[in-house]
């Protein structure tokens, strides 16, 4: 196929993204990725725009096997290479399913040499870059009084329980002397009045933990690769989180004087997620 983009996996792994496809944003021309903001890192991928009213997702090929599983379930540390096929010629290889483009992912294999053991761990934090300034109870009451006066209406007719002592000065301009608010918001006196910053109440500093262990080995007769991974993301919205446990075992061996080669690619993923309401 002609239009092929090859992405350096080392650069993606440095980002620490849960979803390896999400890390392709800005690296592949003509590829648009929209994340939903949830801790799982799930994203919508468009390679050739929107061409149908039905499914516009690209075809994912992992080690030669087509899949529709979310890429946030794949451990990015297990990836050896990523190729994005964008032109129509890919349909001659993968059929009509490649109409929206193809993302080919190859996972790691053992390499010839001594046994290699890798372990990495990382902890990072996520938070809002900027916070919206909100009004407290008094500031909101003053703003509402001004709005009622500007509309020529009686501010004491509000439905929130604000009581205003106001009048006009010598020049006829409205002046607010004082204001009061009922102790409770409801008639049954169960909801007390308070200065509540709801942004602070529903958000927190998110914590992302990632641990990966891999063992690889290779010789002239074969190779093997084994990995374990754990990823946990406590979202910035309270009570949202994502957990993923992954295990992978890739191996291939040459038999009968290299006439026959057998191999297997085995992966196991367990995920749990609580999304924002």
Regions found by a protein language model. Give the residues of each.
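Short, small/polar-rich motifs associated with maturation and membrane association
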Residues: 1-249, 253-269
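Outer-membrane beta-barrel translocator/channel fold
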Residues: 271-277
């Amino acid at each position: 196929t002609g239009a092929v983009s090859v992405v350096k996996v080392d650069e993606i792994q440095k980002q620490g993204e849960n979803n390896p496809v999400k890390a392709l944003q800005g690296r592949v021309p003509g590829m648009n990725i929209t994340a939903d903001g949830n801790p799982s890192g799930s994203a919508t991928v468009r390679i050739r725009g929107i061409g149908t009213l039905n499914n516009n997702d690209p075809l994912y090929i992992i080690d030669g096997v087509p899949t529709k599983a979310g890429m946030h379930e794949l451990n990015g540390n297990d990836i050896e290479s990523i190729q994005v096929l964008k032109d129509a010629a890919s349909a001659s290889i993968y059929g009509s399913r490649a109409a929206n483009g193809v993302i080919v992912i190859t996972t790691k294999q053992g390499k010839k040499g001594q046994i290699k053991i890798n372990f990495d761990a990382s902890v990072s934090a996520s938070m809002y870059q900027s916070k919206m300034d909100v009004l407290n109870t008094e500031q909101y009451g003053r703003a509402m009084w001004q709005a009622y006066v500007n509309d020529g209406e009686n501010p004491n007719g509000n439905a929130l329980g604000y009581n205003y002592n106001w009048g006009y000065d010598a020049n006829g301009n409205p002046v607010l002397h004082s204001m009061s608010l009922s102790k409770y918001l409801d008639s049954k006196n169960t909801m007390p009045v308070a200065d509540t910053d709801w942004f602070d109440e529903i958000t927190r500093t998110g914590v992302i933990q990632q641990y990966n262990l891999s063992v690889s080995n290779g010789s002239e007769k074969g190779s093997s690769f084994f990995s374990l991974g754990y990823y946990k993301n406590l979202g910035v919205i309270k009570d949202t989180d994502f957990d993923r446990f992954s295990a992978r075992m890739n191996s291939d061996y040459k038999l009968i004087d290299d006439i026959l080669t057998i191999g297997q690619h085995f992966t196991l993923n367990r995920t749990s997620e609580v999304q924002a309401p």
